[in-house]
Amino acid sequence: MSKHTLSADVPVVSMDAITKTFPGVKALDQVRLDLYPGQVTALVGENGAGKSTTVKILTGIYQPDGGTIRIAGAPVILNTPNDASAAGITAIHQETVLFDELTVAENIFIGHAPRTKWGLIDKAAMHRKARGLLDEIGAPFDTGAYLRELGIANKHLVAIARALSVDARVVIMDEPTAALSHKEIEELYELVETLKAQGKAILFISHKFDEIFRIADRYTVFRDGAFVSDGLISDIDQDALVKMMVGRAVDHIFPERQAALGEEVLQVAGYAHPTEFAGIGFTLKRGEILGFYGLVGAGRSELMQALFGITRPSKGVTKINGDIRVIRSPADAVNNGIVYVPEDRGKQGVVIGLPIFQNITLPSLGRTSQSGFLRMAEEFKLARDYAERLDLRAAALDQDVGNLSGGNQQKVVIAKWLATQPQVIILDEPTKGIDIGSKAAVHEFMAELAGQGLAVIMVSSEIPEVIGMSDRVIVMREGRIAAEVQGEDLTPETLVRHAAGIAPAPESIPA
């Protein structure tokens, strides 16, 4: 038990000058983070601030390019998840990494089950120890129950019991309340207090300010992959934390636009989904860029997938040019002039293994075929026209799309859907993971599309992008529209407050 006897003012884990670079992106730049025994440290920052990369470094999934990690003052190298586990670091993710077809006890002790003297798994000892761990955290379910029989909250308890089973000194909780009910969240808070009393150092990642200020003892703020500030949560307020999160300069100058809005092209009313969103309604005009902002779990991407027919809402009406349309599939959406550029280009956007030109022309084969036969020359011409419009950088259009950079893959996806001649284009995180030059090119092209009368919906987690590109912004929180913001009200602080459910600052409340 010597792991837990450190003084409360001596960090269990220290990360110092940690740097991590991916192709074209510096994810972490000289960041530091200290975790203390018996205390909760909230790691705070916008989407893309470097929180997830930090967690992956601490859990041995990524290795830093520079800097030092110390545990109880001694430098360590965490090359693998096993190294992190052996060092007493465990993570409980928003989506628990457990196995539905195994029992509770098997999930708790997978990889380190007690053994008999003959080397066989000692099932009696495993269930006995599992029962003790579950009792310790107030989990009432049976150790022999299959995980598939449990709800999300109880699966979290299994993950926590697993962390305790390896005598973890550091417990990382990454958005642990995202899928929990109010009652389940309260139970999780009680469990956090139990872990604190046991001397665990807890890294708590959340976008919800109310829970940060309720359970955290310390805070650390990252912004754009860099350390901003840390300290005691009792020494700051929500206003100060918001300013630390968003107080950065815009990366580049966004294109100037003189929005000339046309008639209403899309109307959404009463959209609802059993688990993702409810009460959604908005309109969109030709030539308009409508931004959607929100935090993790807000339901933005899920709403866009419903608009495009990937999923079906349980209720709601879609009108296009004033006429009610029923969209049951992506084909229905495309036929009605709605296209969707997804966030996950590799899985949903491009077809790896096919050449660039075929990726661009896939949804438009009717335009490049005659009597059921493809006309290769027409297919190449269509692909070349849109590739040139987007300044697609490729050695040849017949090369595998998988060989392109992220930015150029994004251009292929946009070209593919523009070739269908849509009325509405939905861009989900259009510049995520691409370099600054490609970002600027995508922004210029978005402005050009709007200028030509195309209606654009942009989902983005980057506040400068949302403000710099949008005519209006709809902020979503927990599956509902929290606010619609435009004009002088469109500020970083306003967006963060609405997204996190924070009341306006006193000076901004009208008299």
UniProtKB/Swiss-Prot annotation:
It comes from Roseobacter denitrificans (strain ATCC 33942 / OCh 114). It catalyses: D-ribose(out) + ATP + H2O = D-ribose(in) + ADP + phosphate + H(+). Pfam families: ABC_tran. Gene3D superfamilies: P-loop containing nucleotide triphosphate hydrolases (3.40.50.300). ATP binds at G45, E46, N47, G48, A49, G50, K51, S52. It is an enzyme of class 7 (translocase). Keywords: ATP-binding, Cell inner membrane, Cell membrane, Membrane, Nucleotide-binding, Repeat, Sugar transport, Translocase, Transport. This is Ribose import ATP-binding protein RbsA. The complex is composed of an ATP-binding protein (RbsA), two transmembrane proteins (RbsC) and a solute-binding protein (RbsB). SUPFAM superfamilies: P-loop containing nucleoside triphosphate hydrolases (SSF52540). Residues 13-249, 260-503 form the ABC transporter domain. GO terms for cellular component: plasma membrane. Belongs to the ABC transporter superfamily. Ribose importer (TC 3.A.1.2.1) family. The gene is rbsA. It is found in: Cell inner membrane. Part of the ABC transporter complex RbsABC involved in ribose import. Responsible for energy coupling to the transport system. CDD domains: ABC_Carb_Monos_I (cd03216), ABC_Carb_Monos_II (cd03215). Signal peptide: none annotated. The keyword Zinc does not apply.
